[in-house]
Protein backbone atom coordinates (compact mmCIF):
# COMPACT_ATOMS: atom_id res chain seq x y z
CA UNK A 1 0.00 0.00 0.00
CA UNK A 2 2.88 2.40 0.61
CA UNK A 3 3.89 2.19 -3.06
CA UNK A 4 0.35 3.06 -4.10
CA UNK A 5 0.14 5.94 -1.62
CA UNK A 6 3.45 7.34 -2.89
CA UNK A 7 2.30 7.00 -6.47
CA UNK A 8 -0.96 8.89 -5.90
CA UNK A 9 0.72 11.61 -3.87
CA UNK A 10 3.05 12.26 -6.81
CA UNK A 11 0.31 11.84 -9.45
CA UNK A 12 -2.52 13.80 -7.81
CA UNK A 13 -2.41 16.91 -9.99
CA UNK A 14 -2.13 14.97 -13.26
CA UNK A 15 -4.88 12.58 -12.17
CA UNK A 16 -7.14 15.53 -11.43
CA UNK A 17 -6.73 16.65 -15.05
CA UNK A 18 -8.21 13.42 -16.39
CA UNK A 19 -11.68 14.63 -15.45
CA UNK A 20 -11.64 17.61 -17.76
CA UNK A 21 -9.29 20.24 -16.40
CA UNK A 22 -7.42 21.17 -19.59
CA UNK A 23 -3.85 21.82 -18.52
CA UNK A 24 -2.09 20.87 -21.73
CA UNK A 25 -3.51 20.15 -25.16
CA UNK A 26 -1.63 16.86 -25.53
CA UNK A 27 -2.92 15.60 -22.16
CA UNK A 28 -6.44 16.60 -23.15
CA UNK A 29 -6.28 14.49 -26.32
CA UNK A 30 -4.70 11.54 -24.49
CA UNK A 31 -7.47 11.69 -21.90
CA UNK A 32 -10.14 11.85 -24.60
CA UNK A 33 -8.63 8.89 -26.45
CA UNK A 34 -7.57 6.54 -23.65
CA UNK A 35 -9.76 7.50 -20.72
CA UNK A 36 -13.25 7.65 -22.19
CA UNK A 37 -14.19 4.77 -19.92
CA UNK A 38 -13.46 6.92 -16.86
CA UNK A 39 -15.84 9.61 -18.10
CA UNK A 40 -18.51 7.02 -18.90
CA UNK A 41 -18.06 5.38 -15.48
CA UNK A 42 -18.45 8.79 -13.82
CA UNK A 43 -21.64 9.59 -15.72
CA UNK A 44 -23.20 6.19 -15.02
CA UNK A 45 -22.39 6.24 -11.31
CA UNK A 46 -23.79 9.74 -10.90
CA UNK A 47 -26.99 8.75 -12.72
CA UNK A 48 -27.39 5.55 -10.67
CA UNK A 49 -27.08 7.59 -7.47
CA UNK A 50 -30.47 9.19 -8.04
CA UNK A 51 -32.40 9.93 -5.98
CA UNK A 52 -29.58 11.53 -3.99
CA UNK A 53 -31.52 14.17 -2.02
CA UNK A 54 -31.18 13.65 1.74
CA UNK A 55 -28.79 10.71 1.24
CA UNK A 56 -25.43 10.17 2.87
CA UNK A 57 -22.49 9.02 0.77
CA UNK A 58 -19.15 7.40 1.58
CA UNK A 59 -16.69 7.90 -1.29
CA UNK A 60 -13.78 5.48 -0.79
CA UNK A 61 -10.60 6.37 -2.63
CA UNK A 62 -12.20 9.72 -3.45
CA UNK A 63 -9.10 11.12 -5.11
CA UNK A 64 -9.54 14.82 -5.92
CA UNK A 65 -13.24 14.65 -5.05
CA UNK A 66 -14.97 14.61 -8.44
CA UNK A 67 -17.70 12.14 -7.43
CA UNK A 68 -18.15 13.64 -3.96
CA UNK A 69 -18.56 17.17 -5.26
CA UNK A 70 -20.90 16.14 -8.09
CA UNK A 71 -23.15 14.29 -5.63
CA UNK A 72 -23.14 17.23 -3.22
CA UNK A 73 -24.19 19.55 -6.05
CA UNK A 74 -27.04 17.15 -6.88
CA UNK A 75 -28.42 17.38 -3.35
CA UNK A 76 -26.68 14.80 -1.15
CA UNK A 77 -27.13 15.62 2.52
CA UNK A 78 -23.61 14.57 3.49
CA UNK A 79 -20.61 13.20 1.61
CA UNK A 80 -17.47 11.85 3.23
CA UNK A 81 -14.52 11.23 0.95
CA UNK A 82 -11.68 9.01 2.17
CA UNK A 83 -8.31 8.67 0.50
CA UNK A 84 -4.92 7.70 1.85
CA UNK A 85 -3.19 10.28 -0.35
CA UNK A 86 -2.61 13.62 1.39
CA UNK A 87 -2.30 15.35 -1.98
CA UNK A 88 -5.62 13.99 -3.25
CA UNK A 89 -7.42 15.08 -0.08
CA UNK A 90 -5.83 18.52 -0.33
CA UNK A 91 -7.17 18.91 -3.89
CA UNK A 92 -10.63 17.65 -2.90
CA UNK A 93 -10.85 19.95 0.12
CA UNK A 94 -9.84 23.00 -1.93
CA UNK A 95 -12.43 22.17 -4.60
CA UNK A 96 -15.22 21.76 -2.06
CA UNK A 97 -14.27 25.06 -0.42
CA UNK A 98 -14.06 26.91 -3.75
CA UNK A 99 -17.56 25.68 -4.66
CA UNK A 100 -19.03 26.44 -1.22
CA UNK A 101 -19.69 22.76 -0.56
CA UNK A 102 -17.46 22.17 2.46
CA UNK A 103 -20.55 22.05 4.71
CA UNK A 104 -21.70 18.97 2.74
CA UNK A 105 -18.40 17.44 1.56
CA UNK A 106 -15.86 16.43 4.17
CA UNK A 107 -12.59 14.76 3.25
CA UNK A 108 -10.22 12.70 5.39
CA UNK A 109 -6.77 11.26 4.84
CA UNK A 110 -7.68 7.73 5.86
CA UNK A 111 -7.19 4.17 4.71
CA UNK A 112 -10.58 2.45 4.51
CA UNK A 113 -9.19 -0.47 6.49
CA UNK A 114 -8.57 1.94 9.40
CA UNK A 115 -11.98 3.62 9.22
CA UNK A 116 -14.61 2.61 11.78
CA UNK A 117 -17.67 4.86 11.52
CA UNK A 118 -20.48 4.93 14.05
CA UNK A 119 -23.14 4.97 11.35
CA UNK A 120 -24.02 3.47 7.98
CA UNK A 121 -24.17 5.46 4.75
CA UNK A 122 -26.99 5.31 2.22
CA UNK A 123 -24.53 4.94 -0.66
CA UNK A 124 -20.91 3.83 -0.90
CA UNK A 125 -18.77 4.53 -3.94
CA UNK A 126 -15.52 2.85 -4.97
CA UNK A 127 -14.68 4.02 -8.47
CA UNK A 128 -11.21 3.30 -9.79
CA UNK A 129 -10.33 1.87 -6.40
CA UNK A 130 -10.42 -1.89 -6.82
CA UNK A 131 -7.56 -1.54 -9.32
CA UNK A 132 -5.21 -1.27 -6.32
CA UNK A 133 -6.74 -3.88 -3.99
CA UNK A 134 -5.14 -7.31 -3.70
CA UNK A 135 -7.93 -8.82 -1.54
CA UNK A 136 -11.23 -7.48 -2.96
CA UNK A 137 -13.45 -9.80 -0.91
CA UNK A 138 -12.25 -8.39 2.43
CA UNK A 139 -12.90 -4.88 1.24
CA UNK A 140 -16.34 -5.55 -0.24
CA UNK A 141 -17.42 -7.28 2.97
CA UNK A 142 -16.41 -4.19 4.94
CA UNK A 143 -18.21 -1.84 2.56
CA UNK A 144 -21.38 -3.94 2.68
CA UNK A 145 -21.35 -3.52 6.46
CA UNK A 146 -21.13 0.29 6.06
CA UNK A 147 -23.86 0.68 3.44
CA UNK A 148 -27.65 0.86 3.81
CA UNK A 149 -28.93 1.17 0.25
CA UNK A 150 -26.54 1.04 -2.73
CA UNK A 151 -22.88 0.40 -3.51
CA UNK A 152 -21.21 1.59 -6.70
CA UNK A 153 -18.02 -0.31 -7.49
CA UNK A 154 -15.94 -0.49 -10.64
CA UNK A 155 -13.71 -3.44 -11.43
CA UNK A 156 -11.07 -2.91 -14.13
CA UNK A 157 -11.09 -5.39 -16.99
CA UNK A 158 -8.11 -7.62 -17.54
CA UNK A 159 -8.37 -7.81 -21.33
CA UNK A 160 -8.03 -5.29 -24.11
CA UNK A 161 -5.57 -2.68 -25.27
CA UNK A 162 -6.39 -0.27 -22.45
CA UNK A 163 -5.66 -2.89 -19.80
CA UNK A 164 -2.41 -3.79 -21.55
CA UNK A 165 -1.17 -0.19 -21.70
CA UNK A 166 -2.14 0.37 -18.04
CA UNK A 167 -0.18 -2.71 -16.98
CA UNK A 168 2.87 -1.36 -18.81
CA UNK A 169 2.55 2.15 -17.39
CA UNK A 170 1.97 1.03 -13.80
CA UNK A 171 4.44 -1.85 -13.69
CA UNK A 172 7.15 0.07 -11.81
CA UNK A 173 4.92 2.64 -10.11
CA UNK A 174 2.52 0.63 -7.95
CA UNK A 175 0.67 -2.69 -7.91
CA UNK A 176 -2.28 -2.95 -10.29
CA UNK A 177 -4.99 -5.63 -10.13
CA UNK A 178 -7.25 -6.38 -13.07
CA UNK A 179 -10.25 -8.69 -13.19
CA UNK A 180 -11.93 -10.98 -15.71
Spell out what each predicted region is.
Residues 1-49:
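Conserved class I S-adenosyl-L-methionine
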Residues 61-63:
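Class I SAM-dependent methyltransferase "Motif I" SAM/SAH-binding loop
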Residues 66-112:
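Class I SAM-dependent methyltransferase SAM/SAH-binding core
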Residues 114-119:
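Short conserved loop adjoining the S-adenosyl-L-methionine
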Residues 137-149:
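A short glycine-rich, Lys/Arg-flanked "PGG" loop and its adjoining helix->strand segment in the class I
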Residues 158-177:
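Short, glycine-/aromatic-enriched active-site segment of Class I SAM-dependent methyltransferases
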Amino acid sequence: MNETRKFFNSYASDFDGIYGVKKYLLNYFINQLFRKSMKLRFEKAINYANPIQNKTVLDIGCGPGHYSIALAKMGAEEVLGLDFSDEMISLATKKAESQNLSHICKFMVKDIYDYYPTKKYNYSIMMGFMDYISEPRLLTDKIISLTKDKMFISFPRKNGILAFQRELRYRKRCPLYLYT
